Amino acid sequence: MFTKRTDLAIEAHELWRESAGKTTRLAGVKATEKKIQGYPVTQVDILDREGEAALGKPAGSYRTLDLTAFWQRGDGFFDRAVRAVGQQVKELTPDSGPVLVVGLGNRAMTPDAVGPLAADSILITRHLIDAMPQHFSGFRPVAALRPGVLGTTGVESAEAVRGLVDRLHPSVVIAVDALASRRVGRVCCTVQFSDTGIIPGSGVGNHRSALNLETLGVPVLAVGVPTVVDAATLTADLLEESGLPEPDMETLRSRPENLMVTPRDIDQQVRDLGKVIGYGINWALQDLEIEEINALLS
């Protein structure tokens, strides 16, 4: 059976409701909405195995931050987006202890570069706390890793991260990666936060070993940005919205040309979102204002 592809829990919840015109509450799943810094946040909590089976995702908390208004460049748009991202990170990570930030993805493949770009904006402090305690003793120890991809390194991201976790003993791993969305309107306009971990490369259809509590032994906060839409899923949705009969989607899915759709200005969008996510993580982990973060990174 053809399944519409999405990495977003909010869209998996939508698909369940659409599957048979369901309007009743889904057992094992709780969904709530709120606004932070003017940006909408939808939280989907998968509570048990029934919820896991319905949405096809592991139990945990999934929060989707809608940054559509970010691209309108309104008053204080960047600072508000940074604080909105940072607030989610604060609520889903421990208050103290070392942190390892992992920028997953292939920097040479633009839709997959959001992880490495976010890591570029992380304030690295682990080595400075011991070297210059008079200046950095009040900072939280933070290290960053850009593990690259298996095809260019010969090493699975999970293997590289596991080695560092064994060495650094972080209180949490924050993994940033690209995702796939069902809808074009959510591409580069949403950020998903999940305390269940992540499978590197899932956004561009290149699934690798998972990064989660079971594989690493420490909590993993996944921060994902949808940068692509699966072409078969997009086709099915457009035909459905137009009231036209669907083609043979199994045949379409089985074609060797596994196409992904991405915006034409994806270069600028992933750069902007990488910076917002990196700054948001800094804001959550360090007792600094955004202007101070900017000064330390410049």
Descriptions of predicted regions:
Residues 60, 76, 80, 84, ...:
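Conserved active-site and cofactor/substrate-binding residues in soluble primary-metabolism enzymes
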Residues 137-165, 169:
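A structural-propensity feature for long, helix-poor, extended segments
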Residues 50-94:
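An N-terminal, well-structured beta->alpha segment
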Residues 145-146, 175-298:
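A structural signal for small-residue-enriched, beta-sheet-centric alpha/beta enzyme cores
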Residues 104-112, 151, 178-182:
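Gly/Ser/Thr-rich loops at beta-strand to alpha-helix junctions
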Residues 1-59:
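N-terminal amphipathic/basic leader segments beginning at the initiator methionine
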Residues 66-68, 98-109, 144-148:
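Short glycine-rich or small-residue beta-strand-to-loop segments that form or flank ligand, phosphate
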Residues 106-140, 144:
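Glycine-rich phosphate/diphosphate-binding loop of Rossmann-like nucleotide-binding domains
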